């Protein structure tokens, strides 16, 4: 098998389904400090990381985070449930307790299930109900 990196795909976007793309993009913009791309709206919104996203000229850039409105969106249920989570986002922070007020003010809620036995991460729900974690770096 050839190891020609020019032929390998490059991760450009991670896209979250949600009931309102602009609302969820604003939430993640607040907690990450990323810019909302011009032209974002309730159907499709994109956040661009500092320094810009991935481009063909810069395949080692950081992937952007996008949101798309889905009619009849149903939030994932975790752990278990009729609509299981298919993936989640982990954010590394220096101090979970110091960062928690930021995500709560932005609209997150603390998930009732906290499986970390050593306090290395804490689970939250974003305004659309997607689980995400703050992880001690």
Language-model-derived ranges and their functions:
Residues 54-82, 87-88, 94-97:
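Conserved, structured core segments of small domains
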Residues 69, 134-137:
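Short beta->alpha transition motifs characteristic of CBS
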Residues 126:
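Short, acidic, Ser/Thr-enriched surface-loop or helix-capping motifs
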